[in-house]
Amino acid sequence: MALLDSMTLPERMAFWRGQMERCLRCYACRNACPMCVCRDYCVAESRDPHWMTQEDSVREKLYFQTIHALHLAGRCTGCGECQRACPVGIPILALRQQIGRAVSQLFDGYKAGMDPEAVPPLLGYELEEKNIHEREWK
């Protein structure tokens, strides 16, 4: 994780593109995840609406992994089952942890599994989130 944190954004993107070159898109990471709730209706396999293609491209693989990481943001406990299940050894937990850390920073330090009463940040909706200042975006 420290190595990824020390990289520039273009370096991180190159790293993940290289990892996605090796991805088989077998969904072992998704299937092994105890927090994933979309096994029965996953965007990667949905035909209505048609969110993703079955194209074997780095773009589509990175798209799936990013969507999956965002779906888990705020819920991933860091157990590492996704990474252990990967037949080609992609360090996918690092992507989930990076996105989880960004969510934690945006949503007042939320950590998955610490408070059973807390609602994961991306499962709720506020018209204006406290730490996201959309009106200032240009």
Place the predicted regions along the sequence by residue.
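Ferredoxin-type iron-sulfur electron-transfer modules in oxidoreductases and energy-metabolism complexes
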Residues: M1-E21, V37-K138
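Hydrophobic alpha-helical transmembrane segments of multi-pass inner-membrane transport and secretion
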Residues: C23-C26
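Structured, non-catalytic alpha/beta "coupling" segments that mediate domain-domain communication
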Residues: A28-N31, M35
